[in-house]
Amino acid sequence: MGYFEFIRSNIAWLLAGFILALNSSFGQTFFISIFAGKIQSYFSLSHGDWGSIYMIGTLASATVMVWAGATSDIFRTRSIGVLVLVGLSLSTLLMALNPAVWMLPIIIFLLRFLGQGMLPHISSVSMSRWFIAQRGKALAISNTGYALGEAFLPVVFTILMLTYHWQHLWVVASLFCFLMVPLIWVLLQNERTPQSIAEEVIVFGLLGKSWSRKEVIAHPLFWLMLPAIIGPSACVTSFFFQQVYFAEIKGWTHLQLVALFPIYTIVAIVFNLISGWALDKFGLDRILPFYQIPMVFAFILFYFVSTQIGLAVGLCFLAISAGANSTLPTAFWAEYYGTQFLGTIKALGTAIMVLGSAIGPGMTGFLIDWGFGIEKQYFIFGLYFLFSTLLMYVGVKIYSPDKIVEKIAHPLSAA
């Protein structure tokens, strides 16, 4: 089934996943970081101070995600999605109205937990559970919401900040989230597989069984995959978090940097869709071990380049891996460990990802304050992804897909 026919047949569910992923933008680093300079100036914070606040809020988010993510195994996407959207709307409004520095860690926690954590988690778990044979396409399509937000929201809000006060723009974000609530409610009036009331569709994973989260943590493949799971979140988050400072040391304006983000997003969307197609066509094991190699080139280029053309090339390499990263890790949890406890297992993966996004900004901020430049840090990031690629390759070779037996307890359509 091609993409267009697939979308036409499943438009309501795919659009709901797209909207949830798009609204997650307001809790993502690429959005919050465009206000970094304003927030640091308003509250008189150094790079290390701001990085520490961001790290504290994000670490708290990662801790809560381990348990909160399991709610997607219990409640309808319609109910939990609406609840999280309302919470994110209130959190962005709180950022606009906040007068005190001590409130920042709490606000960052809410933005990161609801935006970065829960919304993409709900979207990806729903796509993985609702679709079986076309899981790759479903994940790729829903994840374009995140990619479009990453491309256009930083540019739009950076331009608006030239005219409007930064706090007023958080009110705009709040209104946008709130307006999506009735749309999600209508789109998911009839869910594809309402988890709490319908007969389940269960796809078993490695060794033909459903894995619990405890079993996953005890499995060696999990530990071989761990650097690859945490790495993109830590390193890519750091890149976007330090974008204002990075532009400054390269001699560019902030607007010149964010103007290149649409290029990044176009490439990310293309490779998001390609990875979804390749996942369904060739299987996860053939593409998973190699998808982080472009990140090696990206971060090494960020170390060397001094022109915007060079930066654009680096962003393209980064986008190739980022696009695939939107689809492949979620498919990994579903295919290797099954879908019966996918919400609980994926919550662990999301918590690890959120943990990485906490460590990255905090670490880079401290190192900058201590005189270790961001460009040198990016070179080390490139070497890190060589290491994670090697471990993925070893893990997939040892735990090969011929040990995976997919069984479907109650099949729906082939889609």
Model-derived segments and their meaning:
Residues 12-47, 68, 239-244:
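Extracytoplasmic
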Residues 64-76, 272-283, 368-369:
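Helix-to-loop junctions at the C-terminal end of transmembrane segments
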Residues 118-131, 324-337:
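Intracellular juxtamembrane helix-capping segments at the cytosolic ends
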Residues 142, 146-193:
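Helix-loop-helix hairpin linking two adjacent transmembrane segments in secondary transporters
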Residues 102-118, 230, 310-324:
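Hydrophobic core of transmembrane alpha-helices in multi-pass small-molecule transporters
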Residues 79-93, 286-300:
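Structural signature of the two symmetry-related core transmembrane helices
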Residues 28, 32-36, 220-272:
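Extracytoplasmic gate region of multi-pass secondary transporters
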Residues 170-186, 377-395:
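Symmetry-related core transmembrane helices of the 12-TM Major Facilitator Superfamily/SLC fold
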